[in-house]
Structure formats: C-alpha cells, structure tokens
Amino acid sequence: MAKTYIFGHKNPDTDAISSAIIMAEFEQLRGNSGAKAYRLGDVSAETQFALDTFNVPAPELLTDDLDGQDVILVDHNEFQQSSDTIASATIKHVIDHHRIANFETAGPLCYRAEPVGCTATILYKMFRERGFEIKPEIAGLMLSAIISDSLLFKSPTCTQQDVKAAEELKDIAKVDIQKYGLDMLKAGASTTDKSVEFLLNMDAKSFTMGDYVTRIAQVNAVDLDEVLNRKEDLEKEMLAVSAQEKYDLFVLVVTDIINSDSKILVVGAEKDKVGEAFNVQLEDDMAFLSGVVSRKKQIVPQITEALTK
C-alpha cells in the first residue's frame, strides 16, 4: 500500500507530535498499512518527557518532498505552518481544533475540526466511535496532549469534552493526572539551559492577519523573569528573524504555568496595535496580560482584530 504521511505543524508541541502518532495508529487499525507518523521539527523537553514515560519513540523527521504524496494533517491546516512542499501534496484528511485559514485543496477530502481544547480529544472520540482499542501508551499520549494544550485544564480553550476524555484516559494510562501533568509541564518549563534562538522557535507559529504577517512564539515557564531577563538578546534575535522572514510583527508570549498569566514582548512597526488589542500600554516593548494563557483563543483573535480594523 502507498505511504500516507501523517504530521502536525512546524515547531511541534506535544499535541502535534502525539496526534501524529495517534492518527497513524488509527489509520493502521482501519487497514491503512502505509500510514506513518512524522514530525516537522525537534521534540521539546515536555514532549520527550511524555514519550519517555509511555515508552514511545519519537516520529521520524520529515525530509521528503511531498509532491503527489498522500498526507494527513493533524493539529493544523494553515499552509505556512506545514511542510514546505504541502501545496503539491494530496491532502486526504485533516484533524484539527484551530481556525481554518490559508488552506485549499485540488480535490475533496475528509476534514474534522471541532472547537475543543486539543486535537487528541477529537482522536479519542474517533477511536471510541469506531470501537477501536486504546492501548495504554496511546492513552498516555492522548492524555499528555490534552494536559499540554489545556495547561492542566486551566486554559480557556479547555472544554468539558477535554476533561471527560482525560478522566477516562488516566485509567487506561494508569497515571495520576495532577501529579503526572505538573511533572510533564515542569519538564518543559525549564529555560535556563536553552538558547534565545531555541526559545523563539520551540513553539512558534506564523499567521496572516489581513495585510500583515505575524509571528507568535510562546514559552511556558515557572518564573517569567527567568526568560525575560534576556530581553535584550531576545529582541535582537526577534528583529533579525523578522527582517529575514519579512514578519511585520513578532510577539513573544511568556506564560506562567503556575499562576496562569503571561507577559508579552513585541517588536515590529505595528507593535502599538498589539497594545491596543489588549487595552494595555506597552512599556519598553512589554506588557503584562492577566489571565492570558491561550495563543489560540486569547491572543490570535485579539491581534487579528486590531490589525484588520
């Protein structure tokens, strides 16, 4: 059978990596023996913690040209967040929980998008709908993705469907949600040993917002100052990358995973629009955003609206 490439977005987070593995398992169970999970970037410390806990190898890094190849996208749909050769691929299926933008196909496809907190929640439902067995390691990855995307159920993107799925998955995976969840989030929140370049790319996405291209990077931390003490180096790199990639705005969101707040650092000609988006005044290119933790629900829509007025 022909190969089916399954992968999440560039700079993959735990949901992107886990959902690729889970979807490959789903496809195998329904008879697609050519289904294989891939990744579009390095595995984060948080994701590696989950993979190690449940003894699952990381997917292979995708380097193939996808021209004419069958692909399944998980946890994304926007082409700028996908493989560089996605436009010439044959997209067979999309499983996602984000907005739909900058996406088109030459032929029909299966597309499942739901307003839940995590792609893995949708995949959990798909397994249940088909009556497929959820192995302990698959349950563990589903649970890890839900915990990651919902910041242990604190994010406003989290729904009752996510919570219900997690409650059922913990029994299959045989873990304590609170203990495992906090350990996993903390594993990904240490930043002292990470370079500025790594921090700005570990969880970053590009968005087209009207006439502007905006880059939004997010870093989870236990101590915000641990990251922002390197403000000068961060700004220098953000400006350099913006010039190289032609970003109109670059926003770094540093999120406190304990207190559920964030600070933003913004560079770009339209940076004042970001302040307007949150009704705050940027001071030294920074602002504190109380209760803001979700890029998808609390950051992207607000900045998009400010830039497209």
Curated annotation (Swiss-Prot):
Its cofactor is Mn(2+). It catalyses: diphosphate + H2O = 2 phosphate + H(+). Mn(2+) 1 binds at residues 9, 13, 75. GO terms for molecular function: inorganic diphosphate phosphatase activity; manganese ion binding. Pfam families: DHH (PF01368), DHHA2 (PF02833). Mn(2+) 2 binds at residues 15, 75, 97, 149. Gene3D superfamilies: DHHA2 domain, inorganic pyrophosphatase (n-terminal core). GO terms for cellular component: cytoplasm. It comes from the Bacteria. It is found in: Cytoplasm. Keywords: Cytoplasm, Hydrolase, Manganese, Metal-binding. Its EC number is 3.6.1.1. HAMAP family: PPase_C. Belongs to the PPase class C family. This is Probable manganese-dependent inorganic pyrophosphatase. It comes from Staphylococcus aureus (strain Mu50 / ATCC 700699).
